[in-house]
Curated annotation (Swiss-Prot):
Lineage of origin: Bacteria, Pseudomonadati, Pseudomonadota, Gammaproteobacteria, Alteromonadales
Signal peptide range: none
Binding site for Mg(2+): D17
Cofactor binding remark: Binds 2 divalent ions per subunit. Binds 1 potassium ion per subunit.
Keywords tagged on the record: ATP-binding, Cytoplasm, Magnesium, Metal-binding, Nucleotide-binding, One-carbon metabolism, Potassium, Transferase
Predominant place of localization: cytoplasm
Cofactors that this protein relies on: Mg(2+); K(+)
Entry's EC annotation: 2.5.1.6
Species of the source: Shewanella pealeana (strain ATCC 700345 / ANG-SQ1)
Entry protein name: S-adenosylmethionine synthase
Amino acid sequence: MAKHLFTSESVSEGHPDKIADQISDAVLDAILEQDPKARVACETYVKTGMVMVGGEVTTSAWVDIEEITRKTVRDIGYTHSDMGFDADSCAILNVIGKQSPDINQGVDRADPKEQGAGDQGLMFGYANNETDVLMPAPITYSHKLVKRQSEVRKDKTLPWLRPDAKSQVTFAYNSDGSIAGIDAVVLSTQHSEDVTQADLIEGVMETIIKPVLPAKWLSKDTKYFINPTGRFVIGGPVGDCGLTGRKIIVDTYGGMARHGGGAFSGKDPSKVDRSAAYAARYVAKNIVAAGLADRCEIQVSYAIGVAEPTSISIETFGTAKVGEELLIDLVRRHFDLRPYGLTEMLNLARPIYQATAAYGHFGRNEFPWEATDKVDALRADAGL
């Protein structure tokens, strides 16, 4: 059978952009803990020796931005100046302002159910049945690799690891869409000066790659690229500046589904960039889990200040067991995609977001949008 290749990448919690995402979501969580109705748009910039936290916030809560930032950086593992970035000595600038009243009047309503969308925009949700979490395999295993890197760094199994790392996995697919195997694996990890390249390659292969990637997909032809430049001592915010919202493909489906362009981290649930993308994943996952399609991509769109979505469309890539018009009817009947409705449906007005800010927002069953609790209702209504 003819094969085609598809590649996705992930980055670790110590990557500069992910540091920024985690700080933004840590601030969001701290505010939501005190004020579930807060309006938050928190952006973070990190560079050598400095973190700047900005954005727009309307809330009755008071939170200690400096302490939240230092704790987040400390938990990631930047705790010594020889890494070029130290949680306890970096400068922290707070330039947060208030949300525009022009936006606020379009969002808030006397009847909460009529809450308008916080902005216009389009969002996509996706699911397929090639992994047990109904996510594409390339992004799923890219996340698993860098998550494993973090685990063996923090438990000192590989004490020379440092926080910054990237992974990339290329899968080969058969012409029928099934997985043929893994064609290539890339893992680059920051490390201390005192480890040899040979020890690093052996440690990464035996302790990170082999325990994570299923042997059934590996072969003598699988290619491995471990720290292919030969040296990765300078990393984190010294190597590159980091910004909130710059890893939107890592955060979602690894490029296998389309993306509306809006980032997630630092945004409260009134921002449909985030909440509607979560709801769209919830819809797509339940459609696939119900056996109504093997692959499902849903698009929703909104107008600022308007509650009802301006459009809903579904693409099943020829895998649907029922008509796509029926699927859209099922979505409208079983899922409330108005901003207030989806926030209530998924219980989003609570501090659950910092955990999403590294290793992907989807395919992790601890999050409410990963539930498959609509399966029976969808199957019954579809006549299956």
